[in-house]
Amino acid sequence: MLDSKLLRTDLETVAAKLKTRGFVLDTAQIDELEAKRKDWQVKTQELQAERNSRSKGIGKAKAAGEDIQPLLDEVANLGDQLEEAKHASDAIQAEIELIYAGIPNLPHDSTPVGNSEDDNVEVRQWGTPKTFDFDIKDHVDLAEARGWYDNDAAVKIASSRFSVLKGPMAKLQRALTQFMLDSHTDAGYEEVYVPFLVNQDSLHGTGQLPKFEADLYKIDKHEEHDTSDRDLYLIPTAEVPVTNLFRDEIIDEDTLPLKFTAHTPCFRSEAGSYGRDTKGLIRQHQFEKVEMVQIVHPDQSYEALESLTQQAESILQKLELPYRVMSLCTGDIGFSAAKTYDLEVWLPGQQAYREISSCSNFEDFQARRLKARFRKGQDKPQLAHTLNGSGLAVGRTLVAVLENYQNADGSITVPTALRSYLGGVEIL
């Protein structure tokens, strides 16, 4: 969430920056609501002062032996008016906060200005796409030919956009997950295990609610014994529960930066992606991801973004998978992000680079919603900066390994970095 003071004092500048994201801020509506809020605030203060004054007069009138009933009636009437004013003021404030909750973050000055993914800027490439001397297959054809992938079973059990992996392919996915976690913990990240179901406060804190509820899976509660008054949702990413570890917390500045990694399944409805990547593991309702989250001092967040991105890159480099780093433009960055790098891995089966990681600096946007703060000694608490990045999307990494390491006979050479996780096996 943006700073409400900034929205009140520099609304036109905010609107101009948001316009580069393709977001049109209704400044007239905000001005009107802010004017109403101020009017009700003044009226409430005036009624409060008047009631206090009349209340003091009751004591004096009583001491003088005067009839105090008229004063009591006036105070009661003022109390009713004050209650109405407070309700009106609260309603206006709630309307303002709902609007503010739907406003995306301001892009950082270094974020390229553009309208769509076509305007994203390549920062660097690593590795060279392999040239094959045989007709290559995509990951679905490779896996189905070996009996490792069963889409029909997944549709029978659940629906489309789910997968059943078998034998070596299931083991390879597990090996990738363990390899990623080990790489991150070796680099100083603390591994955490977190809930896969979260409440509305958690999703609001990281920016998924209220704007993106259609992308989430909400749990309907039917049991009579369930007396919980909180709706729960399946997590779309580990970013949500891990970052929310620090909701309503004040952290000692000396402990910063805090770095965490977690492996979780992720669940997304993929609303709006009808007809895209319907085949295989690229776009699923349920998928595995290893996530990295950092809580840092505001002065260090852009240095942290570079470090976070390089850590995600290190996984691809160890697996010797060609990739490129893209700086997302203002029209393509996520709702909560100020700056984002996407890592795109080369997929021979598609003859294209595809996203495999997104690394973002949210500055204080999430922290303001979360009330995630830090302080030095007894100083006043300050909002921290939050960052997160995929390290990596496990299913897409599995796709990249299968397609880049395929052999003419349909076998798969195991990347050197993974062999110790598969008992030394070199060929699948």
Curated annotation (Swiss-Prot):
What Gene3D superfamilies does this protein's entry cite?
Bira Bifunctional Protein, Domain 2 (3.30.930.10), Serine-tRNA synthetase, tRNA binding domain (1.10.287.40)
- At the top level, the lineage of the source is Bacteria
Please name every pair of cysteines joined by a disulfide bond in this record: none
Q: Which GO terms describe its molecular function?
A: ATP binding; serine-tRNA ligase activity
Instruction: Tell me a GO biological process for this protein.
Output: selenocysteine biosynthetic process
- Indicate the enzyme's highest-level EC class: ligase
Q: Which GO terms describe its cellular component?
A: cytoplasm
Keywords from the named record: Aminoacyl-tRNA synthetase, ATP-binding, Cytoplasm, Ligase, Nucleotide-binding, Protein biosynthesis
Can the keyword RNA-binding be found in this entry's annotation?
A: no
Pathway recorded for this protein: Aminoacyl-tRNA biosynthesis; selenocysteinyl-tRNA(Sec) biosynthesis; L-seryl-tRNA(Sec) from L-serine and tRNA(Sec): step 1/1
Q: EC annotation? A: 6.1.1.11
Q: Where in the cell is it found?
A: Cytoplasm
Give coiled-coil spans as residue ranges: none
Where along this sequence does the record place binding of L-serine?
237-239, 291, 390
The cross-references to SUPFAM superfamilies, in alphabetical order and at most eight, read: Class II aaRS and biotin synthetases, tRNA-binding arm
The residues that hold ATP are 268-270, 355-358
**Which reaction(s) are listed as its catalytic activity?**
tRNA(Ser) + L-serine + ATP = L-seryl-tRNA(Ser) + AMP + diphosphate + H(+); tRNA(Sec) + L-serine + ATP = L-seryl-tRNA(Sec) + AMP + diphosphate + H(+)
**InterPro entries with a match to the protein in the record:** aa-tRNA-synt_IIb, aa-tRNA-synth_II, aa-tRNA-synth_II/BPL/LPL, Ser-tRNA-ligase_type_1, Ser-tRNA-synth_1_N, SerRS_1_N_sf, SerRS_core, tRNA-bd_arm
Q: Name one Pfam family in it.
A: Seryl_tRNA_N
Q: What does this protein do?
A: Catalyzes the attachment of serine to tRNA(Ser). Is also able to aminoacylate tRNA(Sec) with serine, to form the misacylated tRNA L-seryl-tRNA(Sec), which will be further converted into selenocysteinyl-tRNA(Sec).
Family membership: Belongs to the class-II aminoacyl-tRNA synthetase family. Type-1 seryl-tRNA synthetase subfamily.
Whom does it interact with, and what assembly results?
A: Homodimer. The tRNA molecule binds across the dimer.
PANTHER family per record: SERINE--TRNA LIGASE (PTHR43697:SF1), SERYL-TRNA SYNTHETASE (PTHR43697)
For this protein, the record's NCBIfam families field holds: serS
Q: What is known of its domains?
A: Consists of two distinct domains, a catalytic core and a N-terminal extension that is involved in tRNA binding.
* UniProt protein name: Serine--tRNA ligase
Which organism is this entry from? Hydrogenovibrio crunogenus (strain DSM 25203 / XCL-2)
Upper lineage ranks? Bacteria, Pseudomonadati, Pseudomonadota, Gammaproteobacteria, Thiotrichales
Gene that produces this protein: serS
